[in-house]
Amino acid sequence: MGCRQSRHSRGKRAEKVEETQTELLEALDKEGRILEGRHEEAGQVPQTSNAQEKVSLSDCIQEAKASLQNTCASHVSPQEATQAKMNKVDGSILSRLYRNHIQDYGSPGPFWEQELESLHHVIEMKNERIHELEKQLFLLEMLKEKNLILALKNTTLRQEVEDLQFQAGNRLTMSRQLRKDLLQDLEKESQNGHCCSRRRSH
């Protein structure tokens, strides 16, 4: 209540200053017009002197107006500065009250509802991305298992090939040995046959 009354009284003082300024300006204009009319009605002063007095009177009126406006501005500016400070204080108080209201009642305004919707949309997009990454990870795990199975099969096949090569080498060695033995046996038989034929001839 005290803040409202002080703001109300300050507003009244500012309005009163503006009204006083307007009244003084109107009075100066009225006085200038009256003086000019008197000079024109008198008709006793030469034309040039009357024109000079009009110019001088107009300059005085303009100076008085400028001085009055500066004086009123000096009174209004502190009022505006004070009002700006009060608005700033009111804004901080309203912000704090709004935060407390949200904490107590959980009833956000349209702006925060839009922000929550945007946040919810972002969360949904992140969840979709996570699901996609999980699918990719699952496929990678399956490919990894398949690669392990293929690697085991490849190792088994290599072992079998090595065994077959070893067996083939052994058979080749055996066949060579058999051939060698056969040749030796044939040579022995042929030598024995020559010896027998010589004995018969003697």
From Swiss-Prot:
UniProt keyword annotations, A-Z: Coiled coil, Cytoplasm, Cytoskeleton, Lipoprotein, Myristate, Phosphoprotein
Coiled-coil stretches noted in the UniProt entry, renumbered to this chain: 112-146
Biased composition regions of type Basic and acidic residues, renumbered to the chain: 32-42
Disordered as annotated region, ranges: 1-20, 32-52
Lipidated residue numbers (N-myristoyl glycine): G2
Main location: cytoplasm
Biological role: May act as a scaffold to regulate the recruitment and assembly of spindle midzone components. Required for the localization of AURKB and PLK1 to the spindle midzone.
Signal peptide range: none
Domain of life: Eukaryota
Name of protein: Coiled-coil domain-containing protein 69
Entry's Gene Ontology cellular component terms: cytoplasm; midbody; spindle midzone
Residue numbers of Phosphoserine PTMs: S92
Location of this chain's protein in the cell: Cytoplasm, Cytoskeleton, Spindle; Midbody
Gene responsible for this protein: Ccdc69
Biased composition (Basic residues): 1-11
Family from the record: Belongs to the CCDC69 family.
InterPro entries named among the record's database cross-references: MTUS1/CCDC69
GO biological process, one term: spindle midzone assembly
Organism: Mus musculus (Mouse)
